[in-house]
Design a protein with these regions (language model features):
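A short beta-loop-alpha structural element at the N-terminal edge
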Residues: 5-20
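Conserved GNAT-fold acetyl-CoA-binding loop/helix
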Residues: 19-46
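A short helix-loop-beta-strand connector motif used in the catalytic cores of GNAT acetyltransferases and
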Residues: 44-56, 73
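Conserved beta-hairpin
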Residues: 53-65
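A short, internal acetyl-CoA/4′-phosphopantetheine-binding micro-motif in the GNAT/acyltransferase core
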Residues: 73-84, 108
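Conserved acetyl-CoA-binding loop-helix of GNAT-fold acetyltransferases
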Residues: 85-98, 116-120
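Conserved GNAT acetyl-CoA-binding A-motif
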Residues: 98-110
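Conserved acetyl-CoA-binding loop of GNAT-fold acetyltransferases
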Residues: 119-129
Length: 145
């Protein structure tokens, strides 16, 4: 990771890279969910991303990660696997924290790495529910300014 980076709004020509990061990261991170789930939802998510508030992290003209929002709900933070644990997710999260007074998100109970990350960043668990599409327990978390 260099000192020449920027966070900017998603551009339409970013979508193929963003979707590759989305698919690769979900399959790797959520190994308790069959990969066919992510593949089957690919086109739906692609359309949703193109119609959402999405910010990308670009390092030396290479797109390395993104964060997607729907109003005040974080739909996900995704960083290329070889760029993880370098502070990119935190920078993306801090960027949107400066835009919003509060943020919600859902995170799978089994995704302990993400759960700890969000708690460290000031999110607290509000409730839990079962994601009907995966039958996995997820926490609903909140951050307030």
């Amino acid at each position: 990771m260099s000192k020449i980076f920027m966070i900017r709004k998603l551009q339409e020509n970013d979508i193929d890279i963003v979707m590759k990061i989305w698919l690769d990261t979900n399959i790797k991170t959520h190994n308790y969910i069959d990969s066919s789930y992510w593949i089957e939802n690919y086109n739906y998510v692609k359309d949703a991303i193109l119609n959402s508030e999405v910010y990308v992290y670009v390092d030396n003209s290479t797109l390395c990660g993104f964060i997607g929002l729907s109003n005040n709900t974080i739909e996900g933070i995704f960083v290329k696997s070889d760029m993880q644990s370098k502070g990119i997710g935190k920078m993306l999260l801090d960027y949107v924290k400066n835009l919003k007074d509060n943020l919600f998100l859902n995170v799978y109970q089994k995704n302990t790495y993400a759960l700890k990350f969000y708690q460290r960043e000031g999110f607290s668990i509000q409730s839990q529910q079962v994601d009907v599409s995966t039958n996995e327990i997820e926490y609903i978390m909140l951050w307030k300014c």
